[in-house]
UniProtKB/Swiss-Prot annotation:
UniProt GO cellular component terms: ribonucleoprotein complex; ribosome
UniProt GO BP: translation
Entry protein name: Small ribosomal subunit protein uS8
Protein role: One of the primary rRNA binding proteins, it binds directly to 16S rRNA central domain where it helps coordinate assembly of the platform of the 30S subunit.
UniProt keywords, alphabetically: Ribonucleoprotein, Ribosomal protein, RNA-binding, rRNA-binding
InterPro entries xrefs: Ribosomal_uS8 (IPR000630), Ribosomal_uS8_CS (IPR047863), Ribosomal_uS8_sf (IPR035987)
Family: Belongs to the universal ribosomal protein uS8 family.
Length: 128
């Protein structure tokens, strides 16, 4: 049983980047798809696709950029210890070279976008 599907998703992407794999398939969830869309928008991924394996059973196919831009994905807010930040406390990852992903009242978004919109929320991931 997977207790933290988001951490499992992050590990799968990070392991694929280390192994220089082009694509991975993970069990689908709405939150994983939204996180992948933010990573796609920020240029870390090439393509994402929702695939139906069987009736009402889906997988998320994630295609990484060719030279893997991801060196580390760190899960910040965990099921046992949630981390919430206001827009003034959103961290600057590696002086702007990385991004953080937040879950806000307006959806899942990158930290710099949330800061610009003056939105705080749950700090999900740091990618660099």
């Amino acid at each position: 049983m997977i207790t933290d599907p988001i951490a499992d998703f992050c590990s799968a992407i990070q392991n694929a980047a280390y192994a220089k794999k082009k694509e991975i398939k993970v069990p689908y969830s709405f939150l994983k798809e939204r996180i992948a869309q933010v990573m796609l928008h920020e240029g870390y991924l090439e393509k994402i696709e929702k695939i139906e394996v069987r009736k009402n059973i889906f997988e998320l196919k994630v295609v990484l950029k060719e030279p893997a831009l991801i060196t580390k994905i760190k899960r910040i807010s965990k099921p046992g210890l949630r981390q919430y930040v206001g827009y003034k406390e959103i961290p600057n990852i590696l002086r702007g070279l990385g991004i953080c992903i937040l879950s806000t009242s307006r959806g899942i978004m990158a930290g710099h976008r949330a800061k610009r919109m003056k939105l705080g929320g749950e700090l999900l991931l740091a990618i660099y």
